[in-house]
């Protein structure tokens, strides 16, 4: 997964003094929870893509704790951060289509896309299926 333009700018502006770290209250750098979202089309550094429909499908973004105490994310190593716990979506109540991309947001709906990327293998999600990322499947890279 790659960081979006929003996140790259936020990090650079914070590192180089444009943003005061204590004033980041509403930014992704100060969120206790991040949200994993699934897409049926390509995402980009500026956002976009078709997120799986929430209408009658039982789809919702999955909340993932964003702190050191819950161990949901591994420590970054060589510019790579991975999920340290499985991320499991609810059983689909109707077809979600073919999931091709994933993104991380700072809100349960809307919000800012933090990181995004294509799946190594797309997956058609039919009614009754459960979509899951195993430990280490999500890798966010800063390079």
What positions do the PLM features span?
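Small cysteine-rich, disulfide-bonded extracellular modules of the LU/uPAR three-finger superfamily
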Residues: 1-102, 106-143
């Amino acid at each position: 997964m790659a960081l979006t333009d929003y996140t790259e700018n936020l990090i650079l502006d914070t590192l180089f003094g444009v943003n005061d770290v204590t004033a980041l209250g509403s930014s992704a750098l100060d969120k206790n929870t991040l949200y994993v979202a699934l897409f049926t089309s390509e995402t980009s550094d500026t956002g976009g893509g078709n997120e799986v429909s929430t209408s009658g499908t039982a789809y919702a973004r999955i909340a993932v704790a964003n702190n050191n105490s819950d161990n949901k994310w591994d420590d970054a190593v060589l510019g790579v951060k991975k999920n340290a716990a499985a991320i499991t979506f609810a059983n689909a109540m109707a077809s979600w289509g073919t999931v091709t991309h994933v993104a991380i947001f700072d809100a349960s709906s809307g919000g800012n896309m933090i990181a995004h990327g294509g799946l190594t293998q797309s997956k058609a999600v039919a009614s009754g299926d459960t979509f899951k990322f195993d430990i280490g499947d999500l890798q966010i890279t800063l390079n």
